[in-house]
Structure formats: structure tokens, C-alpha cells
Amino acid sequence: GGLLAAQIAHMAGVKAYIADPPVVDEMDDVARITGMPMCPRKSVFHALNQKATARLHCGLVYEESNLIVAHMGGGISVGAHRQGKIVDVNNALDGDGPFAPDRAGSIPSSELIKVCFSGQYTREELLKYISSKGGMVAYLGTNSVMQVMERIEQGDQRAKKVLDALCYNVSKQIGAMAAALAG
């Protein structure tokens, strides 16, 4: 969002203005703490899209509302919006929250450690699995939900199971954000 606006403005010789930053860090301190002090949770998600969508579609005054917003693209971020601030959200890029069309999402820690030390993958390959070659594409060879839905209509049970799992994981993340808003 922000980089694209800057590029277009530069080409046109004008200034660019955006309403929200592409990434923002408004997370509650308690939301950052994990079971390993050297691995805090980070605020990396689709902030610009989430805030704009909330303002446009909630039908309420955003700054006076508590909302849960799910951005569902190649990466999926689910944010708890409390009175205009996103106080908790999964890191949609680095392996937190639901898996997505091309991102791995949360992975059981001990299983990931086994894979890391298996000698079968390089560091770069594993980072790609987390951020661009994981999720639905790792199971089905495509990141297109439309193609997966077509496969399901043709009777592909594996495609149905993977898409059901994606939806299930998004639903769980929405539930987690409901708990974050309840305090």
C-alpha cells in the first residue's frame, strides 16, 4: 500500500497520502509474551487493509467499537480491534496463526525443530515454506482458492479436507481474538 502510493506519486510528481500505515504496532504488552523470552510475538500483518475494511464496513464509529477483522489473502491475519487500535493479531508473514493459501501459519514447535535439523532442507527453503510455499500450496500445488473449490466440485476429497482445515484454523484464530477483546 504505502510503497505503491509513494511510487505512483513519484512518477506523477505529487505527494502521496495514506490514511493508515501498511504496518502498525498497537499490540497490548501481554499479547507479545510467549513461552520463550527470546521469541516475542511481533506485530506484522495487513494493518492498512484491516483498518480500512473495519472503517468502511462495520457501520459503527471505528474508534468506539470492538471488532475482529480477518484479512484473507495469500496470507491471513486476524486482528482484535479495540476502540481503533489493533491490540492483538497473528503475524501473518512469519508463521503465526492459521495457515493460508501460501503461508504455513503456526506449526507445532517440536515438529518444526525436527524438520530444521533433518538435513533435508536449507534454511532458505524452510523460510520459503513459512512465508510463500507453505499452507494450501504445499498440500495442493496451488494458492488459488477458486481452483481448490473447482477441484472440490469435481470430487477431490483431499482438496476439501485442506480447505476445511484452512477454514477451521481461521475460525480458531477468530475465537482467540474474541478472547483477547474480552480481556
Feature names for model-found ranges:
Residues 31-118:
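Glycine-rich phosphate-binding loop of actin/hexokinase-like ATP-binding domains
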Residues 1-22:
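Conserved phosphate-binding loops in N-terminal lobes of ATP-dependent enzymes
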Residues 94-99, 109-110, 123, 130-138, ...:
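Active-site C-terminal subdomain of aminotransferase-like
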Residues 3, 44-52, 107-110, 121, ...:
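Conserved active-site and cofactor/substrate-binding residues in soluble primary-metabolism enzymes
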Residues 26-29, 139-140:
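Short acidic/His/Gly/Ser-rich catalytic and metal-binding motifs that mark active-site loops
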Residues 128-182:
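Adenine-nucleotide phosphate-binding core of ATP-dependent small-molecule kinases
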Residues 20-25, 133:
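Short glycine-enriched loops at secondary-structure junctions
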Residues 2, 75-79, 173:
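Short glycine/serine/threonine-rich phosphate/pyrophosphate-binding segments
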